Amino acid sequence: MLFRSMRRTLPAVLDPDLLRRCYPLRYLGLMTVCFVLMRPIMVGQDPTLGPLMKVLTAAVFAWLVNLHIVRRIPVSAPAILFVLYRLASLLPTVYRDGDLLNWGYVTLSQLSILMLIELYAGYGRQERRRLLRVMTDLLLIYLLINYVMIMTGTGSVASWGQHEFFAQPSYLLGIRTRVTDCVFPAILLAMLYDSGSRRRWGWRTVLALTSGIVQIVTLQVATAWVGAAIMAIVYPAVRLRLRAGGLLSMRGATLLGVAVTLLVVVARVQTYFAAQIEGLLGKSVTMTGRTDLWDAAIPILADSPLFGYGINSQFGAFIPAFKGLLWQAHNQYLQIAYDGGLVAVGLFIALLWTTSARADASRCDDRVRAALIAVYTAMSVMSVSEIYVYNMGTFYLFPFLASRAEELLGGGGRPEPGEGPRPSPVAAGGPTGTITPTGTITRIR
């Protein structure tokens, strides 16, 4: 009684119930964890914040490992495949004296995201939605800050070596083309979170779509236009069930990504559509010089096809270019082949196939299934000319979320009748109430 009377005299801003209900404060722990694991490019490149993020990532990984051991969470097939996939590039990295620190940092960071998703997949509905909400809001904040930096002209200048010819503005999410690393995952997370509400379109989905489209238009990212068009076609097709399975599935999207890479990079099928590409996208069939990079990359990869060359200190750049500069492959599968050879490529496809099959077999509703398939298909096709496993590494979110789609958004994670949800390890406080001697809860806050 004394505590209650004292609490009534406190200012509203000091009310513990208010602090518990306040979204930024209540979710601060989880928001911090997600920020460390999904840090924007500018933060990772900062000479002070970059090393700090590496230390914090190791701490978060150790914390998650401890939670998995204490709660006896079994090691999943996606986790095993991801570890094997990363180990495939470890051997050539060590053998060729590559960037072992970068390999370890990326491995711990992405594995921690998977472990965080699997941890929350076992909690109750409220906790599962909390994870989706925090991840969605974090990426939306990134997009809004990035757009403000674009409009105000703030940021830095990204250059390669001493050649100012290649210098271009860099914002929170990196250079112009890197905005797609955040746009499409933000759209997916927003659609997944809003699928749990009764509204057809939640404000997070609307904000993700509008902010993404505005930045794509402002920065003139042709690759993102292709992805947006694919997403706009696939989403209603899945919702209308025009064709069950086939290409309109997660496994179909995985196969489509591999097939498009072979057709565009190896067979050069785009040469037959030169007029359409130039008319719609304003691009030539060389795809802004990417075909020249692929022509130079393939002979290099052929010299070490099985195990590749490992993670180098040039952030994956290995193709000789203008004035001694090195470039990345500008194709996701070619870059993975350089990092870990055909072994890494095979394990990467196995990871995508396993998680896609699990998502296809899940009992998620049509909105969830359509969102996963549409955005994943778009990113799979866009990875033909870009690399989304580097930088923020947001491409990994697709197999990670797909592997736990039913638990996160279906009924797999709900507690049994009479059993309360497990408390979140990073949530500030839980529900409180008064229980009568008969076991009836009379009041809950």
Where are these regions (language model features)?
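Transmembrane alpha-helices of multi-pass inner-membrane enzymes
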Residues: 61, 191, 369-382, 387-429, ...
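Membrane-interface helix-loop-helix junctions at transmembrane boundaries of multi-pass membrane enzymes
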Residues: 13-23, 66-77, 193-206, 243-252, ...
